Structures are given as C-alpha cells and as structure tokens.
Design a protein with these regions (language model features):
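C-terminal motif of bacterial Sec signal peptides marking the signal peptidase cleavage site
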Residues: 18-20
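An aromatic- and glycine-enriched ligand-binding surface/loop that stacks and positions planar moieties
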Residues: 22-81, 157, 189-192, 205-365
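Conserved, well-structured interaction surfaces
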Residues: 41-57, 79-154, 169-182, 188-203, ...
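TPR-repeat structural position
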Residues: 181, 225, 425-426
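C-terminal substrate/ligand-recognition segments
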Residues: 329-436
C-alpha cells in the first residue's frame, strides 16, 4: 500500500514538472534556433558556414555533365538517376534530378533569407559593423547564386526574400523571370560590395572576385552581354587570379588553393567530406579496381581541335587510326590516350590486348579494360584522366578534390564571349582567348607561333 502511494506521488510530481516546463517555454541552449540565434559573431559565422555544405552546390555525378553529349554511362537510358531521363526526353518534375535541385536551392535561399532577417540582433548586440557587412554579403551571394541557377533551369519562380512557411510559399505563385533577374543582379552587387578580395589562408568562403565571376556567368546565360562583360572584366582587373601552368594538375586532389580557383567548395578526407564512392568506383578503370563505366563520349573526343587549330573533319593532321595524335593537349589531359600509363597500368581497350603491363610490378597481366576479357569494361573504350591519378587507388574510396565551381579560365572566356556578342572584338578579347589557349600548349600567350 505504501509502495503504491509512493508511485502515485512520483507520477503526480512528474506531471507537475512537465506542466511547469511547458509553461516556462525555455529556449534550448544546446543548439541554434531562430528564437535566439544570429546574436553574436560566432553564431553568424556558424550560420554562414552552413551555406557551403557541399550538397547545396554539387549536382548528380558531381556536375550536370552527365546530361550533356560529353559523357556516356552504360546504364544511361535504363536506370533512374543516371541521366537517361534527360537524354531521352522523359524527365518529369517528380524525378530526383529535378526535385533535388529545386529543393536544395530553396533550402539555401531560406538559410540566406533567415540570416538577413535576423542579423539585426547581432547589430543591436554591438557586433563589429565590418563583420556584419561581410556576413550579409555571404548571404546575398548564396541567394544570388541559387536564384541564378533556378532561373536558368526553370524560368518563372516563386521568389522569396524573407522567411516564409511552406503554406505561405505555396500561395505566392511564380514571379516572372524578367522581374527576378534584376533582383539577382542586385544581390550579386551587394555581395561584391561586402566580400573581401581575399580571405588569406581561408578558402572555403567566396570572395569579391567570385561574386563578380558568378554574376558574369548568370548575365551570360541571360543574354545580358554588357553586364557579363563588365562583371568578368572587373574580376580580371582585381589582378589576383591567374592560370595554373599545367591544365591537368588543376583538377587533382593534391592541388590545393591556387590562383586559378575563383570559387570552389573544399573537400576533406579528415572531415569525411569526400567524392561520392559511386563516382570514384565508376571513374577508375577496371584494372585499377574500378568499373570504368562512367566515360567520356566519342563526341567529346571528336570536339578537341587538331594542333593546326582545325576540327577533325577538316584537318589533314587527324588520323582516325590514332585519334589522340596531333590534338589539342587538353584532349589527352581529359581522356586517357590508348597505350599510355594510367593509375599503374598501360591503358589499352583493344579486343586484341588480352594482356597488359602492370607498371608497378613490371609484369604482364590479364587486361580487364578490354571487353574481350571483361564483359563490362568501358563500352566505348574511353576512360577519364581528368582529375584522376594514383591517389584515387591508394586512398580508395576516399578521394577529396575541391569541387570547383568557377575557374579563372571561365572568367577569361566569358569576357571574350560577351565582347564578341557585343561585336566589340579588340586586343583584350584576343588576349583573353590566347591566354587560355597558350596554357594548354605550355607556352606564353605572346608566342602565337607555338599554338593555333
């Protein structure tokens, strides 16, 4: 009986405690929340750090290249999520390629809006005005980039520049594309005004040059040539960017911060932010332990000019029996040339090459990159060299190259394209194009006789 009374007393006490907790409405102190967050510089820094979660920026198979003529995948027109729905025209809004892009972009827009709406708390708490301006600029940058992407893919959009509930967002409908474009330019301008030219050793956050370059890309896509040319030129005139001497090295995981990377999201093996294992496995050739199933297309191979500057169907230098000879060097920096070493083996997809040299052991072994030996070797005989080296094998499956969103080569070529569209072709345009071409051949831009 006494025990029963004790239990009843405990239960009653717990009930009173629960009722008391409910009425007190205590704000949690162990996690960020909209009721108390954005009040200190530390909280603002943590908030903007979340803008650069890789999932907000990358695309399936690391980019939308799978949706172009540049790649092929052996299940491309069969498996959902492999890009086939784009290529065969069966894509709908319910497919992952579509709704994940829409969902992730609006998530980041919502984060940016929430910071901009609540940063007044930090201002009222006396946080350094220079820091406030910088944090705002990062939010404007994120919002501009994501609306720019959504406009490119979808046109008219629901436009939100403040926090909304889902029901409120559903009720506003779509805003015409033409009305949103100027708002995106305004956001980019706010970012340009508030971001630093450099973060010093820190490279995970966007700079003034990144905002200029992303504005130029958006303007180019929208056909606003004057805006694109000016934004690209402004980035060039900062004089903080340059091209790496070796094109192929730019994309390796061993290459860290370099002046060619205008905007990139860093990965880190130590922090478990790595390339998707699917991509690593399918990018490596079969002799190196991969599948060799996500490949460059023959369309891409054919796109590279010959060393005389002519396309393969016009150049007398092109030999269809030796398709890699006399080609722009970026061709073999991107696609593995037959008969050359790649990740420890001589790569030869020929049906006649049933044995291949293992360059690490010096011994001949069964050639799993020939379909005469392995049924599922590369279906078109091509595999990627770009970005892939021995470290992919040594660290498998943990590979962590930066996710590059904007390079200085992009800026130079965007400037040239915009000026050409304006019919304003001058020495600055030729210099921009020649700088990129010359780098491919490993010479100076002024040595025009050494490259086409």
């Amino acid at each position: 009986m006494n025990t029963r009374k004790t239990y009843i007393g405990i239960i009653a006490g717990l009930g009173l405690m629960a009722a008391g907790c409910t009425s007190m409405d205590i704000t949690p102190k162990d996690q960020g929340n909209s009721a108390s967050w954005y009040s200190t510089e530390v909280e603002l820094q943590l908030a903007v750090n979340e803008f650069y979660i890789l999932g907000y920026w990358n695309r399936p198979l690391e980019s939308s290249e799978q949706w172009t003529d540049n790649t092929t995948y052996r299940q491309q027109n069969r498996a959902a999520g492999s890009g086939g729905s784009v290529l065969d025209g069966t894509m709908t809004g319910s497919m992952w390629e579509v709704y994940s892009l829409w969902q992730q972009d609006y998530k980041l827009i919502s984060r940016a809006n929430t910071l901009l709406e609540n940063i007044h708390r930090a201002e009222e708490n006396g946080v350094n005005p220079a820091a406030i301006k910088r944090f705002k600029a990062e939010a404007y940058f994120a919002r501009a980039c994501k609306y720019a992407e959504l406009l490119f893919f979808f046109g008219d959009l629901p436009y939100m520049d403040k926090y909304m509930t889902i029901s409120e967002a559903e009720a506003i409908g779509r805003k015409p594309k033409e009305e949103i474009i100027p708002l995106v330019y305004d956001d980019f301008d706010e970012a340009i005004d508030g971001l630093p030219v450099s973060w010093g050793a820190e490279h995970a956050h966007p700079t003034k040059g990144a905002a200029m370059a992303m504005k130029a890309r958006f303007a180019l896509y929208m056909g606003d040539w004057e805006i694109a040319a000016k934004a690209a030129k402004d980035c060039m005139d900062l004089n903080v960017y340059s091209l790496a001497s070796d094109y192929g090295s730019v994309f390796l995981q061993s290459t860290g911060v370099i002046p060619e990377k205008v905007f990139a999201i860093p990965r880190s093996i130590e922090n478990s932010v790595t390339l998707d294992e699917w991509f690593v496995k399918n990018g490596l050739p079969r002799n190196a332990g991969g599948y060799g199933s996500y490949n460059p297309s023959w369309d891409l191979l054919a796109a590279y000019l010959c060393t005389d500057g002519l396309p393969i169907d016009e150049s007398p230098l092109f030999n269809p029996q030796k398709p890699f000879e006399n080609r722009d060097p970026r061709c073999t920096a991107t696609i593995v040339e037959f008969g050359t070493e790649h990740v420890g083996f001589i790569y030869d997809p020929s049906p006649a090459a049933t044995k291949v040299l293992n360059t690490k052991t010096g011994a001949m072994q069964s050639n799993n990159d020939s379909r005469a030996v392995a049924q599922y070797a590369s279906f078109n005989g091509l595999v990627w060299r770009k970005g892939i080296d021995q470290s992919w094998v040594d660290n498998f499956p943990k590979v962590a190259p930066d996710y590059i969103i904007m390079r200085y080569a992009d800026v130079l070529l965007m400037y040239a394209e915009a000026k050409i569209e304006l019919n304003e072709i001058d020495d600055s345009v030729l210099d921009a194009i020649n700088t990129v071409r010359a780098r491919a051949y490993g010479v100076k831009a002024g040595d025009t006789s050494l490259y086409p």
